[in-house]
């Protein structure tokens, strides 16, 4: 191996342990395709600015296209990073007098920052698509369960009757915010550092705006020092992923709980379950458990990124090499988790009978009974709260006579004397009527849920339109880049 970097300044060759310690080749596989694009755009710009000759540009571009077709497997993995390995392969193909000109006016510092942003950009767009698919699945399942009664929980204790639609749209709303955070994060990722060189830009007459356009970036990171040293876009992305995974972990936790015999609200499709090596009857929700655990991985990746970037002096430091594996792991885990969650929800069986049967367990209708007392009997809510609280010590199905007896002890008179009837009590204890009365914006009534789901679908349509525009902008830019490549080669 002839190292095109070390042969000048450095006299000795590192041993295998040092090479393995300092190499980023494994993580750099993630940015291989982006590195080719960056090289193509930079080379075209060099030719346009007359920094390299047209014939050298042609040979370099042809070599890069060959390397692209050969794939990363053909590169020498003993080099310390993908950039030097790729450039060395190019020089082997076209000679140093030609291939050695490609890196004019450029550093690995701005090169790697550009590659990471390009690759992350693509994955963010894919994540947006996957989040939209998940939100659609949640909305569809909610629409099918507008009248599916279930207990609502606080502190994991039965609280009030609600519906499965109400419960799932809460998760859908959270996923919607995750989608919007991802879209907002994209704006700061899709900026070009290319042309910043090591940190002080270059004396070559580069056109940074030209490479920015060729690669489909929305703009430049203008300060060259900031361009090569900033990794806050990785921290922001990892924060978005961690927040998303926390939201998914909540759903995963409920899937695990709801799959138990004690709840038996749902049953996962067999594809998302496993069995025991000793207990043949077991059907374990392993996929949901793993997703729940993987949320911790993304939190760990975020913490690692924060620690790596902490207190680094300007401008570039090699510490930043350790950031790439962490964002890769976080991103891959998050995207896989979104797809898995979508599949679990789309294919799970819902036990509506069990859900409805437990909708009133634990006196979940107590709040509506207290509200009825306030509306009918004109007593303060705190007084009604006390009366119903005493009744909660009983069966959870109080009669008018039992209510009057407690009321006598609390306020010195019966509530029936204030207009409360047995029919009103029964209606207050009816979980279906409980839900139907809660028709305020965001409440669990079927009418309210229909409005919320329709509003959610309108937002998804808007998000989809924005996403399609982002994808089109990227695709058009890359298509134009390859058109420019063909023009340079065909001259």
From Swiss-Prot:
This is Argininosuccinate lyase. Transmembrane segments: none annotated. It is found in: Cytoplasm. It comes from the Archaea. Keywords: Amino-acid biosynthesis, Arginine biosynthesis, Cytoplasm, Lyase. One of its GO terms (molecular function) is argininosuccinate lyase activity. Its EC number is 4.3.2.1. Its main location: cytoplasm. SUPFAM superfamilies: L-aspartase-like. The keyword rRNA-binding does not apply. GO terms for cellular component: cytosol. It catalyses: 2-(N(omega)-L-arginino)succinate = fumarate + L-arginine. It comes from Methanococcoides burtonii (strain DSM 6242 / NBRC 107633 / OCM 468 / ACE-M). One of its GO terms (biological process) is arginine biosynthetic process via ornithine. Belongs to the lyase 1 family. Argininosuccinate lyase subfamily. Pathway: Amino-acid biosynthesis; L-arginine biosynthesis; L-arginine from L-ornithine and carbamoyl phosphate: step 3/3.
């Amino acid at each position: 191996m002839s190292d095109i970097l070390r042969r000048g300044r450095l006299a000795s060759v590192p041993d295998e342990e040092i090479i393995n310690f300092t190499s980023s080749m494994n993580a750099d596989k993630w940015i291989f395709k982006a590195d080719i694009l960056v090289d193509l755009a930079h080379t075209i710009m060099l030719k346009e600015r007359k920094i390299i000759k047209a014939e050298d540009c042609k040979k370099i571009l042809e070599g890069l296209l060959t390397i692209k077709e050969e794939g990363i497997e053909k590169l020498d993995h003993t080099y310390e990073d993908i950039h030097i390995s790729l450039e060395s392969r190019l020089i082997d193909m076209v000679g140093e007098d030609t291939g050695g000109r490609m890196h004019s006016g450029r550093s690995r510092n701005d090169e790697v920052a550009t590659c990471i942003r390009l690759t992350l950009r693509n994955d963010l767009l894919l994540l947006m698509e996957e989040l939209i698919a998940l939100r659609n699945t949640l909305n569809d399942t909610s629409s099918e369960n507008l009248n599916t009664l279930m207990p609502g929980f606080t502190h994991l204790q039965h609280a009030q009757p609600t519906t499965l639609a109400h419960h799932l749209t809460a998760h859908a709303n959270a996923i919607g915010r995750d989608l919007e955070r991802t879209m907002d994060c994209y704006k700061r990722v899709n900026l070009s550092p290319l042309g910043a060189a090591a940190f002080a830009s270059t004396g070559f007459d580069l056109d940074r705006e030209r490479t920015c356009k060729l690669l489909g970036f929305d703009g430049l990171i203008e300060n060259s020092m900031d361009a090569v040293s900033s990794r806050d876009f990785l921290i922001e992305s990892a924060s978005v992923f961690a927040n998303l995974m926390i939201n998914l972990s909540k759903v995963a936790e409920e899937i695990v709980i709801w799959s138990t015999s004690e709840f038996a609200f749902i049953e996962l499709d067999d594809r998302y379950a496993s069995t025991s090596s000793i207990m043949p009857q077991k059907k374990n929700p392993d996929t949901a458990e793993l997703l729940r655990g993987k949320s911790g991985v993304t939190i760990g990746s975020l913490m690692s990124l924060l620690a790596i970037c902490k207190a680094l002096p300007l401008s570039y430091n090699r510490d930043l090499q350790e950031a790439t594996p962490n964002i890769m792991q976080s991103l891959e885990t998050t995207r896989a988790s979104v797809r898995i969650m979508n599949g679990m929800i789309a294919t799970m069986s819902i036990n509506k009978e069990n859900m409805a049967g437990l909708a009133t367990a634990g006196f979940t209708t107590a709040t509506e009974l207290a509200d009825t007392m306030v509306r009918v009997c004109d007593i303060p809510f705190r007084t009604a709260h006390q009366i119903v609280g005493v009744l909660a010590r009983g069966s959870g199905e109080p009669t008018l006579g039992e209510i009057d007896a407690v009321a006598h002890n609390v306020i010195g008179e019966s509530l029936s004397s204030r207009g409360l009837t047995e029919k009103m009590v029964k209606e207050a204890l009816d979980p279906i009527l409980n839900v139907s009365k809660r028709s305020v914006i965001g409440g669990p009534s079927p009418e309210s849920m229909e409005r919320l789901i329709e509003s959610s679908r309108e937002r998804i349509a808007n998000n989809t339109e924005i996403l399609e525009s982002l994808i089109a902008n990227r695709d058009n830019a890359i298509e134009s880049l390859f058109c420019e490549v063909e023009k340079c080669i065909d001259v």
